[in-house]
Amino acid sequence: MASTDSARTLVAIPARWGSTRFPGKPLHLIAGKALVQHVWERCQECREIDDVIIATDDARIAEAAASFGAKAVLTDPDHPSGTDRIAEAAKSFPDHRVVINVQGDEPLISPALIDELARTLRADPAVKMITAAAPIQDAAQISDANVVKVIFDTQGDALYFSRSPLPYVRNPDPWPRSYRHLGIYGFQRSFLFQFVAWPPSRLEQTESLEQLRALENGTRIRVVLTDELSPGVDTPEQAAAIEKHLTGK
């Protein structure tokens, strides 16, 4: 598990104790392991990553991380987002030029997707920020505000993200392919610190989508396409569904 060039790469997994809907979620057991341990183990399978850390606001999560061999960094409990949390944690790793933010509630995240984001950032320092998207297969998701849509240009850079349908379809025959945004981000280290230094932007606050802060400030976001969806865990019921998938029971 190491990058093949001089640009060291860090994966940071934000893990917050105080989820409104699911307190203590990172330590919820799924098939005998904490949720955050599943995410960490998937990241350990990556071939392009030098270090994986868990950025947390709670000593209980840090202690659990140590018990299964993970590095944990305790951060300010009052960060407004996971990106702010990983930015604080990344300060402890000054030799890492690339930082990947892997959501702490996606136990089936694809190691290959993480590697692809890391490779792209290392190969082209002009790409300051990167994320991923997948084709929407269920038409109902196009109008679902909980499914964030993205449109991008011919170079693969995002034009806009929205909870509304993107694009608006005036003539539905044929219906154009729509893409859902996946909540994984990668940053050039220097841009990560620039991003969290900017105040929340107008569109970001309107849509409640922090990636719009980058677009409003004139920064392109590269979008990597994938067919591998990684369901998140927001409720105990979703955790039970993941356990059933993992155990076949």
Residue ranges and their predicted role:
Residues 11, 52-54, 99, 129-130, ...:
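Hydrophobic/aromatic residues located in beta-strands of well-ordered beta-sheets
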Residues 2-4, 176-249:
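Conserved alpha/beta core of the MobA/IspD/sugar-nucleotide pyrophosphorylase nucleotidyltransferase superfamily
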Residues 49, 95-96, 124-127, 219:
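Short, high-confidence coil segments that cap the C-terminus of an alpha-helix
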Residues 109-201:
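Conserved core of the sugar-phosphate nucleotidyltransferase
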Residues 3-55:
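N-terminal glycine-rich phosphate-binding loop and ensuing alpha1 helix
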